[in-house]
Amino acid sequence: MKNMISRRNFLAAAGVVAAAGVLTACGGSSSTAASAAGSSAAAASGDTIKVGVMGPLSGNVSVYGQAVVNGAALYLKQVNANGGINGKQIEILTEDEQGDATQAVNCFTKMVDEGMTALIGDVTTTPTLAVVAESADYNMPMVTASATAEAGTYDAETDTVNANVFRATFTDPFQGIKMADYAYQKLGYTKAAVIFKKGADYNEGLAENFVNEFESLGGIIVDQESYSEGDVDFKTQLTTILGKAPETVFCPNYYEEVGQILSQAESVGLTVPFLGGDGWDGLEGYATNDQLKDTYFCANYAKGSNSEFEDAYKAEYGQEYPNGFSPLGYDAAKTVVYGLQAAEDAGLEAGTDDYKQAVIDAIASGTIDGITGTFTFDEHHDPVKQTAILTYVDGKPVLKEMF
């Protein structure tokens, strides 16, 4: 099995987050790793509680992983600086799964062996689904900041909720439906095309729900085009779309591919407005200002919504928060801490079955005062909150409206 490089950040007793921790492979071990047999007992070591944070810290979607991890670490540092949870400090176990599902499971298992008692992660959809399946065996409290596939928290085929899993972001179906509603009801489009990557849970989930909702409203889907993993030339699909004369194109893909698609759309003469989901976050710099004009996408957070968070992020990392995944990481950490607080208040031992169940129960019934909005969780463990619609002005994403 291919080893992957991981990074581990620790919160010291003073609450200082290490910018770069010990580098290890997910399948390996380090001086702080607990044995598999002692993993539950090791969840609380003295006055610390071990919390796992995982995501793609390298690779094609590392901009999301870094953003989530930094956002989560920022909140956990603040908790530690304010005395921790009933006096206990939080120790972070951070792993880089490189955007790969197999590596993600390896990372999860490694952190369980090291004494993890709750998980913030994963970040993108496919690795998250792999970890969800593994986490059920441990009833591990798990909050993903940003994975949007419905199956992350709920299996529609069996009508089963993944009892230990929650998310801070909205779902793929929600995004697809919201953008179809916005296109038809707010922008007045009646003819739309779709271009998406086939075989990818996120892309296909948004595309399917956009199509179903748009048609249910009375709109016409004039064309649906797909492409495969690794494709970089989209001109054939875009030329076909051009010939069908849509008023808009829904492009539920990640920012790097979206940038290529917008550029190639311009080159073939397809200049209608494009729409997208939260995978567009980070798109600036991958497309020109003209290519971004009159485009819209949905997101959990809009810049300027919470100056306290934005100022704290800049003070901690020396730069502005990179995209909306940092606020989601912050809120995912806040959700986990909400559950940990309840378990600690009950006097339970970290890592035990009762402790983990107390964390899960508290989150399920709680109200989280997050920076992406105040939210509760519905029966599928998805957050109930509003959606930000963003557009681009001079190449920068700005809030158009809440919808």
Show the residue positions of the predicted features.
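Short, polar/charged alpha-helical segment
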Residues: 61-86, 208-213
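Beta-alpha junction/loop-to-helix N-cap segments that form part of ligand/metal-binding clefts
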Residues: 63-68, 82-154, 227-232, 264
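Segments of small-molecule ligand-sensing domains
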Residues: 316, 320-323, 337-399
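Extracellular/periplasmic periplasmic-binding protein-like sensory domains
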Residues: 262-330, 397-399
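Periplasmic-binding protein-like
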Residues: 53, 111-123, 143-145, 193-196, ...
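Extracytoplasmic ligand/sensor domains, especially the bilobed periplasmic-binding protein
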Residues: 116-223, 273-297
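Short, low-complexity disordered leader/linker segments with a strong preference
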Residues: 1-50, 403
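Extracytoplasmic "Venus flytrap"
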Residues: 45, 52-71, 95-101, 123-124, ...
